[in-house]
Amino acid sequence: MLTVDFIESIVAQMTPTITIENVVDNGDGTQTLSICDTYWIRKYLDITIDGNSYVVSSFIKDTSVTIPSTTLVTVDTFVLTAPYYFHGSPMQVNNEFMISKKDANKYPLIYLVESLTDSHYDELDSRDKDTNLRIFFLDSFANKRDEVDAYYSNVIVPLNASLNYFVELLKSDSTTLPFSYDVTNRVKVGVYSTNEGNTSQIFDDPLDGVEFVSTVTLMKSDECKC
């Protein structure tokens, strides 16, 4: 399996079931859900509960989520949608993904940077390959005026939760050997320079993100290749 497809299969599993412990009608057109693990839920995220779509009004990490009360929530659980996934060079991502999709349809985004270098083992080795991964977990709040002073709690913290869940799934995959990894919080990753300062624009959208870097060893799969 190609590395880009393997990572896509991991991202597709990022659909945790969230338990709602309590629902309070705030009497102001909103309702607050008590939730122990908010994962990557953040303000303005679209979530679906019992077939109804809500835009998150506010949240407290791993405590509660406030949404409109047009339809009061009566179920105990809901499934969080997996982040969007894209791979390619920065120019490909900007041209094919950032420009072609509206804001509501592309964030949060998990972006696997290419080109990828895979080091393959001998055919008699139980290991398949070492793959060098550089993955960005990205989100944008540039058009939300009230987020200027709160980007860290509203963007970086949820993105770290998204990264942690991804790593948990990656490590639990049967073909993955134990690995270490580096994490870097990236503010305004839409602007990039190889030297000092931010001088060269890569993405049209101004983004905040979390960068994951690791070399992961994958074992050969037992699946039939017939």
PLM feature spans:
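Short, charged interaction patches at domain edges and termini
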Residues: 1-16, 118-130, 176-226
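Structural beta-strand segments of beta-rich domains
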Residues: 31-33
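Loop/turn positions that initiate beta-strands
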Residues: 42-44
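Well-ordered, non-membrane alpha-helical segments in soluble/globular domains
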Residues: 1-12, 154-169
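Small/polar beta-strand repeat architecture
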Residues: 18-27, 36-39, 48-89
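Short beta-strand-to-loop capping motifs
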Residues: 69, 137-140, 216-218
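Acidic, metal/cofactor-coordinating or nucleic-acid-engaging core segments within structured domains
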Residues: 161-183
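Short, solvent-exposed beta-alpha or beta-beta edge segments that form flexible loop/patches at the rim
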Residues: 84-150, 189-206, 224
